[in-house]
């Protein structure tokens, strides 16, 4: 089999057109027959345990289940590779093609993509400009409609207003319109603010895309009127009008039986639901819409920056109007981003409506036979089965000319089945299996910590790597880490085998592997020799900056946990409450040289973000130093004993003769600056004398020469001083 490896710089994810989906799955056989469409909901034949033809595991569509063997068994040899069986139509090739060959389902009725109709922001609603708010800046058209109502009710002498919308748009620019609007606001001054807010948003708010796609309406009039509303609104938007004709009010319950003929004529059956949304999306001219939206954003900005006066009426009206314009501008900014992305990627907005549904390869949704004749299958097979069943049932209902109510219900069920396949629970109700377990959809497979991206693409398992919990290793050096013995044997196995053969301890690789499996004592010195000159990488996810991966010199430790120096925790953003870290072994000489020259922990002392030290004692280390140097605790074992040097103190502490906080006197050989807080002076028989200070005792001879001097301290302070001197090589 010929494998082609193509180099690429990046991967671009965008909307797939129906023709592209067909290219993924559509194939032509030598006999002229096209395959690729999944027409049956069956998976396998439960008598022969073979995939059903044209089903979800069809060998003719996705490839053979067994390599180089057709479904009917006529051809079973390597010499027939590439041949297509004339009896069953199966191509003789490797079975691994079932991991990438796709199929498709021709949907009888188009459905909307749930990611674009039930998302925030709602992409389709933004493109069609029906996103919860009235899409116009001038409110005069609606106000004039109310003025007529006022005139009819109160019989006031209000001048006549233009009847057509084009005349109205010209009329709005005149000073007369501003005067009449002021009169109107005086009439409405007694009205509540909430009523006016609802009045402004009422007409567009009732156009709900979910109601269109899922056929949700209280009666026939509301159902057809909803689609009529969208068509009229979109037609007026294309002409540049600021409003659209109002939908007739719904009738009372006793008059809702028959749908008016004029509504049926204005909204044909084939222009309802997702078909209508698809037609409106197809009619969008992206270039013109971008220009119109940019101009609208500029107009909103001028009004908000008071460059162009807009509202000269009451304070609360002006405040509310500015809030509405802010909302319109924000939605227009979101809309122009969507339009520019569609234009850049060359995608058509109508591709958000699915007419051809791709079927992923069967190896990615397997069916496994268990003991006892039962089968375990992926949830995707059940979701695909529902779609095919409902799609075929809708086709039969259309063929027999079933009532429209039944057909609409079946279309809604088909829409819900596709929604569940793409993202189960996105629209509210979660589809459950027979055991009341939520079915795993395509979105569930790719998202989250255990999804396809983070688990299999970003977090791939590689050779010469391991993972374990980290624990603190306070006795380690800064460039060291504790590596568990079992992990070291497994990671460095090839290096150990080579060293065993080079030293003559094993004659071949098989003997060396047997020595490793039997855990012979001879392995330990060989392992230490290998680790002496071989660093390792430690990585903690997420790797947010370059210090998330550092090199260390491994030290063999017992147990199964990786020991880490506490000072490097801040660079890894790690703590010891169950965090895990990954171990990687650099194989090439270049990688090992990079470890020693650039990536060792002592060489990463400063933070690359701000240049400040990132290796600093904190938390347990500060508390430990404080506890180690605490004094003024009386009545402890060995208090006020005298010691010749630091070694005597450490020896006494190791023999449990003194405690960590015991107050002791230690001889000090260096010169002490003139002490203060003199207490007393005692003269001895040999004419020498002892001067007592607060923390110092000095014995001098009769010539004032110092014989010996002692400092008062604690065992813990001696230990801290001894460690610092040893580390800095200051100890004599």
Swiss-Prot record:
Main location: plastid
Protein residues bound to Zn(2+): 70, 72, 85, 88
Transmembrane segments: none
Biological processes annotated in GO: DNA-templated transcription
Record keyword Transferase present: yes
Cofactor: Mg(2+); Zn(2+)
Binding-site positions, Mg(2+): 575, 577, 579
Catalyzed reactions per annotation: RNA(n) + a ribonucleoside 5'-triphosphate = RNA(n+1) + diphosphate
Pfam families per the UniProt record, alphabetical: RNA_pol_Rpb1_1, RNA_pol_Rpb1_2, RNA_pol_Rpb1_3
The keyword Electron transport appears for this protein: no
EC id: 2.7.7.6
GO CC aspect terms: chloroplast; DNA-directed RNA polymerase complex; mitochondrion
UniProt function note: DNA-dependent RNA polymerase catalyzes the transcription of DNA into RNA using the four ribonucleoside triphosphates as substrates.
Subunit and partners: In plastids the minimal PEP RNA polymerase catalytic core is composed of four subunits: alpha, beta, beta', and beta''. When a (nuclear-encoded) sigma factor is associated with the core the holoenzyme is formed, which can initiate transcription.
Family per similarity comment: Belongs to the RNA polymerase beta' chain family. RpoC1 subfamily.
Protein name: DNA-directed RNA polymerase subunit beta'
